Amino acid sequence: MNQEVMNLFNPQAPAQTFDSIRISIASPEKILSWSYGEIKKPETINYRTFKPERDGLFCARIFGPIKDYECLCGKYKRMKYKGIICEKCGVEVTLSRVRRERMGHIELAAPVAHIWFLKSLPSRIGTLLDMTLKDIERVLYFENYIVTEPGLTSLKEHQLLSEEEYMIAVDEFGEDQFTALIGAEAIYELLASMELEKIAADLRVDLAETTSDLKQKKLMKRLKIVENFLESGNRPEWMIMKIVPVIPPDLRPLVPLDGGRFATSDLNDLYRRVINRNNRLKRLIELRAPGIIIRNEKRMLQEAVDALFDNGRRGRVITGANKRPLKSLSDMLKGKQGRFRQNLLGKRVDYSGRSVIVTGPELKLHQCGLPKKMALELFKPFIYARLDAKGYSSTVKQAKKLVEKERPEVWDILDEVIREHPVLLNRAPTLHRLGIQAFEPTLIEGKAIQLHPLVCTAFNADFDGDQMAVHVPLSLEAQLEARVLMMSTNNILHPANGAPIIVPSQDMVLGLYYLSIVAEKEPGEGMIFADMGELQHALENKVVTLHTKIKGRFKTVDAEGNPVSKIYDTTPGRMIMGELLPKNVNVPFDICNQEMTKKNISKMIDHVYRHCGQKETVIFCDRIMQLGFAHACRAGISFGKDDMVIPESKAKIVAETEALTTEYEQQYNDGLITQGEKYNKVVDAWGKATDKITEEMMARLKAVEFDPVTGRQKQMNSVYMMSHSGARGSVNQMRQLGGMRGLMAKPSGEIIETPIISNFKEGLTVNEYFNSTHGARKGLADTALKTANSGYLTRRLVDVAQDAIISEVDCGAEIGLTMQPIVDAGQIVASIGQRVLGRTALDPILHPVTGEVIVEAGRMIEEKDVEIIEKAGIQSIRIRSALTCETRDGVCAKCYGRDLARGTPVNQGEAVGVIAAQSIGEPGTQLTMRTFHLGGTAQVVDSSYLEASYEGTVKLRNRNVVRNSDGNLVVMGRNMAVLILDATGKERAVHRVTYGSRLFVDEGDTVKRGQRIAEWDPYTRPIMTEVEGYVEFEDLVDGLSVSETADESTGITKRVVIDWRSTPRGSDLKPAMVIKDKAGKILKLSKGGDARFLLSVESILSVEPGAHVKAGDVIARLPMESAKTKDITGGLPRVAELFEARRPKDHAIIAEIDGTVRFGRDYKNKRRIIIEPNDDTIEPVEYLIPKGKPFHLQDGDVIEKGEYILDGNPAPHDILAIKGVEALASYLVNEIQEVYRLQGVLINDKHIEVIVRQMLQKVEITESGDTGYIPGDHVDRIELEEINERLIEEGKKPGSGNPVLLGITKASLQTPSFISAASFQETTRVLTEAAVAGKMDTLQGLKENVIVGRLIPAGTGGMTNQIRRIATARDELIIDERRKTSGSAEANAMLVDMTNNAAE
């Protein structure tokens, strides 16, 4: 009963439950069915009475009353007349809310083309009629006639006629022999008369017959649109409008400002324009005005409607009174300020506040301090309810008064209300899910929010004036989710890499580090203590210090929980820390009996979390935070100017390097080296000098010194302590303070040759200061730009991955990826253990020696397994991956593996796609904000030698070496590798060695760790001969293909190959060097080709004609790019390039087949390379290579599939096509990881795999079979598999396709959900396409559901959806049973009853 009464005042329509949304083109009948009346006048409201004009844009008769339950003239007021239509003013008495829902319409006097279907590319009307957009516009805007019915005349259908031609045709054939129309009517006729089935059939025939690719593409486009119309039930002529809908007036409001003026929505202006022109056109037609006037008016009407729908899409932008373009209906949806992103995906919420944050070290981890004033305001409704319940007030008004007066009982009640009611804290920018966490509020005085210091890392917050927002979860479910999922105590691990994120930083680290220092010769050294009591006593009486070496007894428990103890060599400081460790058999004293750097603290917390669980970890973290602060305060570590030590040897090192650079200068002057080489060498020398000075400085800082008087160890250097502990500062910064600042980079990324020799302690000279401003400014400018770029990258990633949700436990996939350790320049940068931890094993992992099973197939690999795997030295493991998961919607839990933020197998409903996107995007922003801290100091990344990273035996793979005239071994092979094997013959390291490297070892040699294996010149690439003989030049003509450049400063000449194609005389030269024997015959190479070496532009000749050379001698050199500094700047665009799957600028060319290289006939500036296959069944493949590119293959070389013909970054599409999905995945994962690794950012591979999975969702049809697709169509992979399964069952021919790689933007726009795509980018295009195809959005992803305002299908929402589905299925079963037993009437009644319940 109560419910009914309440509903009288606010009749709420039952919420519709729906499962999908469809979009299609509105027919005129549909528009009329929405409309409540025609708008005939352009007036809005009467400016004196402020009442809407009748039949105007705000008419109350059409749209509904202005005030609730009150007609316009005031005859009927109040509820009792509800639903009556006033006979005087014609207004229905109802809620004024209907003015937000009721639409009107305008009957157009002439049809008008809908600009979206006309101008949104590709033009739908154009494609359908097979006419160009220009021609259609000519007809629409009354320039040309179009023949719609040629009759028996010589005119063709769709032929355009100008005014004169039309007149001539009328004279020639007579007016009734043919039909030619002009304007939108003409297009309407053409569209209405189309027989789509027939056209589709014809197009299919044409497609089968055509041979040219271009024609095929065109026909396919047209066929696709025709099919879309046929399938969706849209009619083509609906793209021409005869009726324009008018949106409800409250969505385009007119607001009175003070001073009698009005602020209005632009739409009203645009509608007014349409109505004015339409009425004028009606009048002109009635008056039978001359055709030319009517035509002009029709054209203006078309333009007015165009501007209303999409202003500025065609012609001039229509501007308002203040020269500002008017916002049309399309602009309301588009962009960041449009409906989708402003109001549907991002809403402002109530019950929120924001304030500055201050640190709250005495809080527990799950608490935050909330100012009383804020809490009182935020929790008002709860307080009113509690005041009422406790009988302090009987009405809300009284309660309000009590709260306003801030009576004592109010504060008591506030305490009760707040207890155990979590609030959400958020710091913008929210880059990952840890940017919003829940805390229990404690009330504090003052106006600032107190934040626990340990969560600062997660929020990326500091206390220099940052602000944070507070939100109150209201419903019980919201509070529950906040507590169970978002509480800060539940977010101990970082979702990107599974490492703890609740880690002490800065002061706390310094305090803990200070505690753990060991010092020699302290008082009380060697004492033994039985328990902490004795130790405390000794400390307080200064018998021992915190750093004394002592023996102490550490008490813990064994596996059964019985107390055990053990004596350790340790220090009192470490014993104090050990006291805080949870008592657990797996947490030995050893983890805190070491120097407590930030890394070790992080490891310790991780260890505690893995073995003792979450609760213990949280308590432990809080305790070590307190301890850290206390001791940082007691230690009083600070530093002064004298703590920055300048090494004595600095002057000597600088002098030596200056001497070196002068020598290089001299060599350059003597012409021994080129300008580029000199630059590289100078830069190198200074780089090494800087490193050397830094080493000396660090050695001085680390040095342990003793006080000659007391004999005790002097206090460690404070700066060193801060840096070494990881509290603040890096070696790089210390170098700039006390060593030398080193080389600086120009804004272009090049390094300035003259370094900054001074450091900040000595002070910079004016010139040095000026040189250093470059880098510093570039850093600041970059930061601003890159923050935006990074944010955009994250947005694209989220958009492409938003529907990757864990939807089942196991998909049963039998394919996966092979994981191997990542080796870079001989260093293992990611061990196999790190890579497979928390993943599911695909095959059983066996011990290589004993053969026993370490991990069974289908089990998740845990920490304990990783230890065994690493010890066993296993080098490759097959694991399940999201990339190869076969789940239909989403990913399965087995393929994903461990939920990194919890350390347990991932739960169903986890939105792994969004987590992946945030994990990749968040460090992007972090890094971009971090560039300028280096102050532009250059870091050169180039190595010139290779050292053994292990002891072992050398094995050469693809061995191809010769001894040159100096007796050195020289590598002649393109893909030779040096392997180092351990005693058991297992590969420990693999190094690629480049062509032309000098080898110091040979097959079977043993090497020690750190021994030089090979070296090469990193700045030039050699061209070497592999036969002994005499050099002769071919086509090396002075002035044409070779120039002798004399260096201005030195007068020494060197001979360089120049671009010979620039002159007509030199166009067919092929500059080369040939090696002949004494008789003058050209020698043969081992692979059968002539010993002719083609030279590319910029090669520097190293020998004279006629010189005698031995195998392995360098005959020419190619300069390489000079070393540019690497910085995430190169990084962020690189990541974007990889995710967008763009072809890199100078991309590598990859061999598609195995075979032999042959040179074909060259083009003008391309070189033709043909690969002759080893297998006769395959066609040879040819490649065209730009001639200027450094090219290293010779005629007759053997090449394998997947090898590079031309070096560079390979295009991901090529890798996919040639080597397949797994190779592509490992390439993308490694390349992206490389960029982040340079910055020291850890991201788990699985995140990148999830994104790559989303990029590989489509296949391109190659064989259509009976699928009904056309070759070249892009289809969802899973869709094709399902259709094929069905076809095979029916005994028909299945289709096949190749996987295509789509960039993330493209993939987001191609999601099955048009709502999600429209809210991402190119809104108009997406909606136009969806409407033509009559697309259905099944609301599978997260974004669509947020937009329509439902629970997202992840997490809680995912489970409720599942439960709802099961329930509906069961209900249907029950009703079926009822139907069988008791007849349909009862069952139907039950159905109605159920739907009503569901609606309530």
Curated annotation (Swiss-Prot):
Task: Identify the stretch annotated as signal peptide in this record.
Answer: none
**Which GO molecular function annotations are given, in alphabetical order?**
DNA binding; DNA-directed RNA polymerase activity; magnesium ion binding; zinc ion binding
Q: For this protein, what does the record note about how its cofactor is bound?
A: Binds 1 Mg(2+) ion per subunit.
Q: Which SMART domains does this chain map to? A: RPOLA_N
Residue numbers binding Zn(2+) 1? 71, 73, 86, 89
What GO biological process terms does the UniProt entry carry, in alphabetical order? Answer: DNA-templated transcription
Report residues binding Zn(2+) 2: 811, 885, 892, 895
Q: Which sites bind Mg(2+)?
A: 462, 464, 466
Q: Does the keyword Protein biosynthesis apply?
A: no
Q: Which GO terms describe its cellular component?
A: DNA-directed RNA polymerase complex
- Extract the InterPro entries matched here: DNA-dir_RpoC_beta_prime, DNA-dir_RpoC_beta_prime_bact, RNA_pol_asu, RNA_pol_N, RNA_pol_Rpb1_1, RNA_pol_Rpb1_3, RNA_pol_Rpb1_3_sf, RNA_pol_Rpb1_4
* Keywords recorded for this protein, A-Z: DNA-directed RNA polymerase, Magnesium, Metal-binding, Nucleotidyltransferase, Transcription, Transferase, Zinc
Q: Which family does it belong to?
A: Belongs to the RNA polymerase beta' chain family.
Q: How does it associate, per the subunit comment?
A: The RNAP catalytic core consists of 2 alpha, 1 beta, 1 beta' and 1 omega subunit. When a sigma factor is associated with the core the holoenzyme is formed, which can initiate transcription.
Q: Which NCBIfam families match?
A: rpoC_TIGR (TIGR02386)
Q: State the protein's name.
A: DNA-directed RNA polymerase subunit beta'
Q: Which organism is it from?
A: Brucella suis biovar 1 (strain 1330)
